Amino acid sequence: MSTASLRKRTGSLTILGASALTSLLLAMPAFAGEVYLDGLATAQTHQKFIVTYKDGSTALASPSALTTSLRTAARAVPAKAGKALGLNSVRRLALGPELVRADRALDRAEAETLMRQLAADPNVQSVEVDQILHATLTPNDTRLSEQWAFGTTNAGLNIRPAWDKATGSGTVVAVIDTGITSHADLNANILAGYDFISDATTARDGNGRDSNAADEGDWYAANECGAGIPAASSSWHGTHVAGTVAAVTNNTTGVAGTAYGAKVVPVRVLGKCGGSLSDIADAIVWASGGTVSGIPANANPAEVINMSLGGGGSCSTTMQNAINGAVSRGTTVVVAAGNDASNVSGSLPANCANVIAVAATTSAGAKASYSNFGTGIDVSAPGSSILSTLNSGTTTPGSASYASYNGTSMASPHVAGVVALVQSVAPTALTPAAVETLLKNTARALPGACSGGCGAGIVNADAAVTAAINGGSGGGGGGGNTLTNGTPVTGLGAATGAELNYTITVPAGSGTLTVTTSGGSGDADLYVRAGSAPTDSAYTCRPYRSGNAETCTITAPSGTYYVRLKAYSTFSGVTLRASY
């Protein structure tokens, strides 16, 4: 083995000269208390803080000294609407720290300013957020154990920790499909929809378009839908897809839904022998809050549209215009890649622009044999042996049931559900483009084989939700995403050779910039550079260690720094933090 092929095994790299060390020591007061900023990432605003004063400090013995300490710190936060911030003691905790409360909610920047000012008091030992903790959720649905996509293997969605942070509450997912049947494990999450099938024969309800999105059944006899096409029973496809998105969860019954706090608007476009492009285009417009002549407005415009449907050919002008309109109204459009085991470039509407095209994976984390593939795939998701809500009828609706289906039709609603989770916790609604970037940047590499192209990887629900809560896009993104001082970006991952890029601007007088990576699996290499993006050969700091525990420390760092994580080997679950 040549020396060039050996990886360096070094400690963290510190860019520090002797004179710089002297000035650093002078700039960092020995009495400064510890500031725990991790809690800032748990919510968008904060109002209560825990301040630990040193033994023997006057603030512990004198209420007036405590009041003075709090008022001094509060003055560091700019006034709002002409009113200075108030900060008062609530009570002393059993272990001695003081619980204090601001008289208004503080955003993260304000909270950090306050915490640092509190810690500057020589009497203070530490400051932390009085953050809100939650019970961890394992739903009690009786068939959850059969839903491998919601399990704990690295082939699944990594959704259980995401459910502790988000349920999709307040979001709407439009399922453009065969309509829906009544199901006790689904009904509570269904809003009023619409039947857009204009042909009475296809619709089977005898009256064309109407406000009843019920699935009448899509069965057909041999040769009825074309010469040589065998007979088929009703699929209840829309009911299955809707259950994957938002089945009622934690109800001691049946299955769980990806975004079980979300609501579903069923939009019927597929009936006997399929559905027309013209009907589907109108349905996209309506579902996203657009106007369709002669049709009442949608009272619940969707943040997300799921289309588990498709056909051959290039993306038509009609379909593309409908999708573009939906995206312009802020609706993310998620589409099944198709089940032809061929390049997605030949599958409409997955080959349209402005959609998230989803390939299907197996429980082993490999591309499903039937799934379409190619450079047009954006992400992958579980699609094989997916258990969801169904109906027992072979033609017309019978009783509610459950069944497992295979297909990219099953993968797509998993992604639509994750989008609902993301939008439900984002500080402000993300644009469809930002949603796509976030999903790609937080995706996990397939643990199994994929030939032909499976996009950025398997959607990682927890990483996506965490990135949304933190107001970021999870990494990557060409020009880089902005890091917040002291706030970790978690759940990062990339395939071998890929990279994630960030920036952070450090104000003058900050003393030291420390950038760290930690946790997870695989091997991510950290690069930091002042003023421009680092490369393999140009950087200010590159620890170049095996694994993910790397640190760059830079003194007198005012200015913009570019941070790069490059996958020496596929990594996932990595945390990145920059602080000054």
UniProtKB/Swiss-Prot annotation:
Signal sequence extent: 1-32
Keyword Disulfide bond included in the entry's annotation: yes
Domain Peptidase S8: 147-465
GO cellular component: extracellular region
Alphabetized InterPro entries for the sequence: Peptidase_C_arc/bac, Peptidase_S8/S53_dom, Peptidase_S8/S53_dom_sf, Peptidase_S8_Asp-AS, Peptidase_S8_His-AS, Peptidase_S8_Ser-AS, Peptidase_S8_subtilisin-like, Peptidase_S8_subtilisin-rel
UniProt keyword Disulfide bond, yes or no: yes
Major localization listed first in the record, in broad terms: secreted
GO molecular function: serine-type endopeptidase activity
GO aspect biological process, one term: proteolysis
Propeptide: 33-136
PROSITE patterns: SUBTILASE, SUBTILASE_ASP, SUBTILASE_HIS, SUBTILASE_SER
EC number: 3.4.21.-
Highest taxon in the source lineage: Bacteria
Active-site positions on this chain: D177 (charge relay system), H237 (charge relay system), S409 (charge relay system)
Disulfide-bonded cysteines: C225-C273, C315-C352, C450-C454
Keywords from the named record: Disulfide bond, Hydrolase, Protease, Secreted, Serine protease, Signal, Zymogen
Subcellular location as annotated: Secreted
Protein family per UniProt: Belongs to the peptidase S8 family.
Protein name: Extracellular protease
Species name: Xanthomonas campestris pv. campestris (strain ATCC 33913 / DSM 3586 / NCPPB 528 / LMG 568 / P 25)
Lineage per the UniProt record: Bacteria, Pseudomonadati, Pseudomonadota, Gammaproteobacteria, Lysobacterales
